[in-house]
Every structure is written in C-alpha cells, then in structure tokens.
Amino acid sequence: MVTVGEVRKAQRAEGPATILAIGTATPANCVNQSTYPDYYFRITNSEHKTELKEKFQRMCDKSMITKRYMHLTEEILKENPSFCEYMAPSLDARQDIAVVEVPKLGKEAAQSAIKGWGQPKSKITHVVFCTTSGVDMPGADYQLTKLLGLRPSVKRLMMYQQGCFAGGTVLRLAKDLAENNKGARVLIVCSEITVVTFRGPSEAHLDSLVGQALFGDGAAAVIVGADPTPAEKPLFQLVSAAQTLAPDSCGAIDGHLREVGLTFHLLKDVPSVVSNNIEKCLFEAFNPLGISDWNSVFWIAHPGGPAILDQVEDKLGLKPEKLRATRHVLSEYGNMSSACVLFILDEMRKASSNDGLGTTGEGLEWGVLFGFGPGLTIETVVLHSVPT
C-alpha cells in the first residue's frame, strides 16, 4: 500500500512552472488619444464644461498614450445615454454587455495562445479567468470553457474585482497549480472592458476623470505548465511569487460596484506609495538570488500611469530602456488593468526575438513582473528567461 507522501510526490511536477504561450486581443474600435477629449465631451453632452475639458485635454496629453481600444462605440453610447451621465443608474445595461463581451474577448486571446502553444486544447487541465469588468453566475470561466469547447472536467477558477495587480496574481496561482499537479496545463485569461467604468465628467471627482483618460480594453491569455515537452516552446520560467499590502496605503486605490456601475477612486499620492515600497519588494524577491542591481534584470511593470513609472524609474535609478516594453504597451493600448502585464510579457518576448537578443528577456537572464492595485496591493513575480 502506498503512503500519502508517495502519492504527493507523484502528484508534483519536477521542474518550475513555465509560460508556454501568450496571446492577446482587443476590440476592433480604436480611439485616438489626441482627439479623445473632443469626442468624450461631445458624446457625454458636456461641451459646456470648458474648463473641465481643458483639464481633461491636459490629462490626455500627459498620459503618454497614443491610442486605446474600446468596445463602447459611439453607436452603443447613443443607445445607452445613461452611460454618458456621471451618476445615472445603469448597472443592468452595463452588465448585459459585459457578461457577453468579456468572455468573448477572452476567447480571442485564448485562441491566439492555444495556436502559439501548438498543442491540442484537450490538454488544458485548468482555467483561471480574471476580470474586474462584470459579475455573473455561472461566470466567464464557464462561458470561456463553452466557447473554446474545452473538456467538461477542466478545473475552473473565477477571479472577480481584483483590479490592476491581478496580472501578477493569476501567474502566482498558475505557478502553484502547475507545480503541484504533474502534467497540468493551466490556461489563464485576463479580460477587461471599460463598459462598467465609462461615465461622464464631474468637476467634483477628478480622480474619475483620470480613469477616463487612462483605461482601455484588452484581453490576454497565457498557458502555464511545468516540465515542458519537446513539442512545447518555453518563454519564461516562474521562479517565485509574492503578494503584500503596502503600509499606510488604505484607500489609495479602491473601487465600488454600484447602480451607476463600477466607480474608481485614486489618491494623488499613489505614485509615491508605489515608488516608496517597490525596493523592499524587490529586495525580498531577489536577495536569495544575490541580485541587487535593478538594471541587471528585465522589467515587466504594470504601467498604471506615466507619473508612477517616472517615480519608480527615479527611485530605483533605472535606465530609460528598462521600462521600454512597459511604456510601449501603455502608449499603444492604455491601462488595461489586469491584462497589462501579460501584454508587456508578449511585447518583450517578441521584441527580444526581432532584435536578435539572446533571451526572451531582452538578452538578460533574470527579470521581475511587478503589479499593483486596490489595497494598495503589490504583486512581485521573479522570472527567468529562456534562450531565443
């Protein structure tokens, strides 16, 4: 008779969790950041608020964003005028859109990842779906399983309302699942659309206006597994993962689901809270590896906004090229909440290959994925690149 210890040993993988494929997707509707203030104040019937529009124009100009993708077209907004007011009851209509479009966009990203993986979808054993953009039962994890035609025995986990740090969270969970379930192949999907957060401007709530200038729609999917087969193509190894709450940060970032949709609130000191806590997180993650030069690792940082990136760069003395991939994704897509860091991973491995660098991590061996969001919660994932 076997022992429990022998059973557990047989259940565990031998090697570290490894990212085997990445896929991304966006809605077709693309908005230009330079002209967005004119569009936004026109569609929300707020053109008479000239001073507020000028403030919003400055926010957009300083955002370092070139364009964003949004499911909400002018046609949809005209059909749902309550979305365009600041505080009009509208949750039912928003939910009706989100519960359909969130899994649909996630499916596009997942199909891209599965194609890049090159293995039958029947080998997927676990699904982790993450969104801050809608709540339903059964959830988007169930809908995705049906849309992709996955096996009914696939093990699912649904993550709601985690916010911008959750791209790190899903990788942490996938690491634990892959390393503790021999042969597991975990499909993680982050799908975010702004249908629950879009609303008209308010002079009394400029933090809401900041969100209107930054957030965009996008979905990203990653397949994670340990002990890759010869037919699989490893991209990054997940070495360690940690989560912590920043001290004295209660209320720095929070959100509330109300009849008017999802309201976000950001304090002005968020950039300083993040930058003041990042080095401690890095030290705890990299001290066991003997690494203390933050320019010697590659960076996957949730963009948040340009002020946060600037302060992190300054605090750590990072060279400008360290956050190139992060700034590129912010410019091309805006802040896509949980999906952002996975888009940045995809951008980095593609650019590393195109530029002829030696590894998927810009030619470097070790890297960090850094996410932050409501709490203020910080996720730190240590990555190990593979040769290109």
From Swiss-Prot:
EC number: 2.3.1.74
Pfam families: Chal_sti_synt_C, Chal_sti_synt_N
UniProt keywords, alphabetically: Acyltransferase, Flavonoid biosynthesis, Transferase
Physiological role: The primary product of this enzyme is 4,2',4',6'-tetrahydroxychalcone (also termed naringenin-chalcone or chalcone) which can under specific conditions spontaneously isomerize into naringenin.
CDD domains: CHS_like (cd00831)
DNA damage as UniProt keyword: no
Reaction catalysis annotation: (E)-4-coumaroyl-CoA + 3 malonyl-CoA + 3 H(+) = 2',4,4',6'-tetrahydroxychalcone + 3 CO2 + 4 CoA
Lineage, broadest ranks: Eukaryota, Viridiplantae, Streptophyta, Embryophyta, Tracheophyta
One GO term (biological process): flavonoid biosynthetic process
Family label: Belongs to the thiolase-like superfamily. Chalcone/stilbene synthases family.
Pathway note: Secondary metabolite biosynthesis; flavonoid biosynthesis
InterPro entries assigned: Chalcone/stilbene_synt_C, Chalcone/stilbene_synt_N, Chalcone/stilbene_synthase_AS, Polyketide_synthase_type-III, Thiolase-like
Protein name, as recorded: Chalcone synthase LF3
Source species of the chain: Ipomoea batatas
Residues annotated as the enzyme's active site: C164
